[in-house]
Amino acid sequence: MEDDTPDVSSDSNGDAAYSDYFLDYKSIMDEITITTQPKSGYVIRNKPLRLQCRANHATKIRYKCSSKWIDDSRIEKLIGTDSTSGVGYIDASVDISRIDVDTSGHVDAFQCQCYASGDDDQDVVASDVATVHLAYMRKHFLKSPVAQRVQEGTTLQLPCQAPESDPKAELTWYKDGVVVQPDANVIRASDGSLIMSAARLSDSGNYTCEATNVANSRKTDPVEVQIYVDGGWSEWSPWIGTCHVDCPLLRQHAHRIRDPHDVLPHQRRTRTCNNPAPLNDGEYCKGEEEMTRSCKVPCKLDGGWSSWSDWSACSSSCHRYRTRACTVPPPMNGGQPCFGDDLMTQECPAQLCTADSSRIVISDTAVYGSVASIFIVASFILAILAMFCCKRGNSKKSKPLKPQKMNSEKAGGIYYSEPPGVRRLLLEHQHGTLLGEKISSCSQYFEPPPLPHSTTLRSGKSAFSGYSSTRNAGSRAALIQECSSSSSGSGGKRTMLRTSSSNCSDDDNYATLYDYMEDKSVLGLDTSQNIVAAQIDSNGARLSLSKSGARLIVPELAVEGEKMLYLAVSDTLTDQPHLKPIESALSPVIVIGQCDVSMSAHDNILRRPVVVSFRHCASTFPRDNWQFTLYADEGSGWQKAVTIGEENLNTNMFVQFEQPGKKNDGFGWCHVMTYSLARLMLAGHPRRNSLSAAKRVHLAVFGPTEMSAYRRPFELRVYCVPETGAAMESVWKQEDGSRLLCESNDFILNEKGNLCICIEDVIPGFSCDGPEVVEISETQHRFVAQNGLHCSLKFRPKEINGSQFSTRVIVYQKASSTEPMVMEVSNEPELYDATSEEREKGSVCVEFRLPFGVKDELARLLDMPNESHSDWRGLAKKLHYDRYLQFFASFPDCSPTSLLLDLWEASSSGSARAVPDLLQTLRVMGRPDAVMVLERFLSAFPQIVSP
């Protein structure tokens, strides 16, 4: 019988056989798992990145970053039990600082992991890898917006490219501090630019681009976007005015009227510049606002004779004549012409004709022949004397002159010590023969003939000067005119040359004393002008007449070899071009020329443009109502060279005005870039008839120099002259021997309105010996068009011993909103002590703000155009030189950037921050390469001396 009892042993063996097919739930529940992984992130300056790791069933967690274990003391641990599952866990966190990343020494990314384990460290679980980045943002934007002024309806793009950063920065645009919301017209481009497809007036404002990431937030400088609207004319109004005329009455009185057209009826019509009106300094409508036409008058008028003119002078045949014209009135509408002769001749009266004409002619011929004979004999004698003087002078050349110490007052300002690199040319009118006893030369006196218009400066090294390279007495130069053989027989006034040997440069041509000739017909320019000259080579130079308000910059490589160039200033009316009645001169005549007789006056020696700077008297702030015109004479007479705002491809000069508000006396200067030697003058007229333009004038009060002069009747002279510098220099020469008691700058004078000078608060002991209010009518002051406008104020002392004088002079203009100018006048030396001995001192400097190598390196970087306009065009806009950009690109042999830097050199004269400001401009443009060039230069030369 079989036993049905199960075999336990066999069952046990069977369970063992199937044990591998069942899970060990207990071991699975106790397995270490990481539930919170450390996350990648950024370290921000002083803010570390916190890495967090959580593991279940673990007893400890450690961190390993870039193959190095983190010290356990830095790890914050938290042990707990999950309230839901009841599973135990450990939470560990650590702060990764910038120092950890910087000191890791790994070239690759900084990576961290956490490791969870039990007590026996047999089961270790690693987390995911977390990468730690250094968050940063560079300072400078790769592309920055630039100020723009565009017409309404045009497309406008403001570029912006964030600085180099990690993580990538987000860009936000602001307008007047408010975030710009994109719409159908305002588009945000993928490169960060802000595009306005059709600019609207409401889009005008200050725009800023902001770049933001976790590390920082940076903004560009605000740039102004100005949307302007050019004006447009409305329709013409109907003709206004009646054409009725009483013909019988007109015929009755026609003979009394010089021109009947003055009384004939006219019709008038107008239009308005409001379709649309100009906005945001948009261009005003071109053309006339008003139109008139003469009425067609049916009246028939017969011609009538005018009165006979005065008798002419008697001719050589003892006859004289007089004329009349058929103009009172002229015949109209088929009227009869005048009958009779319009010319009458008769013999001169007996007392005016005592001999027959043939005898007079014979007598004149005899006189002329005698004079010619005497002139020939005198010339022969003078030639012999000149040869004798030359031989005598040559025998004394071996004995060099010893420089003598002279009192500056006695020397008349001849000797000046200058720092190295500065060479001064003295051009003062000397009445004495200061050095005449020391110099003996056959070329000390010569007579230049009258010549054509072109004026040059003959240096001591030219022919006919008797210059010797071994001569120690210095060089000589004189203003003369180049002449042809056909004019060599003409006469001219004698020019005296004197030389100086003290405190001069090694190059004799840098220090020369000029005596002015008194006959302007010899020079072509008034000899009262101020002038400075220098021998210039390829290194260039700066010539300056500071008190006359004129400067000349000759850049490097502007001339080949060595050339003597000069800068002169004249405010004489006869030197100015002929202006239209509505135009007014706004500057003196500025002359740049060559002192080389071997060159033709029409040959251009310049290889690149030079920059001429001068002061003007136009008032352009707060309202600029002037339309400026630059007149130039390049050898063929005065012509309009530039009408500001109307430049075209034929414009060969560039004119730049300083912006209002510029420091260092920069406002009121005009800079002209020209490729030729020329005479220049700035003129202007109101933009339209309905506007009134104003000038800036200089007020000055002169009085006696000696205190004893105030013990007897005396007078004060109040001058009102243009604020150009040269005008005041002319006043100084006119007031030679007087004393400046008080002066004031930038008084605004309108063309219309009488000028009044009022005396107040005269000190007790003196009385006004005349009217207390002097009024100069507008027809007399003529908008200070004439030189030296002034009035005299007379005073009388009441006491014999009184000499201390003071009063108050108030200057104002009727019908003007300008504030009256109050001038406190006193003769106390400690209050205001200035005399006419302060004269112009021309100076020459060979130093520039930037060396040629630095400018050449900047030119190589900025000449290459790019799409963002952060090239030379962007630099021109930043410097406000972008009114006529084509000028800078019109010279094939010249870099546009170098031309801009030449103009910047002239504009920044006297500014101590010129180079740092240029550095900041390049930085705002987003040109770190150009910034590096200037920073390297500034680090090598930290102290930039402003020329």
Curated annotation (Swiss-Prot):
Interacts (via cytoplasmic domain) with src-1 (via SH2 domain and SH3 domain). Interacts with madd-4. Interacts with unc-129; the interaction is direct. Belongs to the unc-5 family. This is Netrin receptor unc-5. GO terms for biological process: chemorepulsion of axon; commissural neuron axon guidance; distal tip cell migration; dorsal/ventral axon guidance; establishment or maintenance of actin cytoskeleton polarity; gonad morphogenesis; mesodermal cell migration; motor neuron axon guidance. Disulfide bonds join C53-C112, C160-C209, C243-C295, C247-C299, C273-C285. GO terms for cellular component: axonal growth cone; membrane raft; plasma membrane. The modification Phosphotyrosine is found at Y510. Residues 230-300, 302-354 form the TSP type-1 domain. Residues 857-938 form the Death domain. One of its GO terms (molecular function) is protein tyrosine kinase binding. Disruption phenotype: Failed distal tip cell migration along the dorsal-ventral axis of the body. RNAi-mediated knockdown in mom-5, ced-10, ced-12 or mig-2 mutant backgrounds suppresses the migratory defect of distal tip cells in the respective single mutants. Residues 530-658 form the ZU5 domain. CDD domains: Death_UNC5-like. Keywords: Cell membrane, Cell projection, Developmental protein, Disulfide bond, Glycoprotein, Immunoglobulin domain, Membrane, Phosphoprotein, Receptor, Repeat, Signal, Transmembrane, Transmembrane helix. Glycans are attached at N206, W305, W308. It holds the Pfam family Ig_2. Changing Y566F: Induces a strong decrease in tyrosine phosphorylation but only weakly affects function in vivo. It comes from the Eukaryota. The chain crosses the membrane at residues 369-389. Its main location: membrane. Residues 390-947 are cytoplasmic. It is found in: Cell membrane; Membrane raft; Cell projection, Neuron projection. Residues 43-141 form the Ig-like domain. Phosphorylated on different cytoplasmic tyrosine residues. May be phosphorylated on tyrosine residues by src-1. Tyrosine phosphorylation is unc-6-dependent. Glycosylated via C-mannosylation by dpy-19 at Trp-305 and Trp-308.
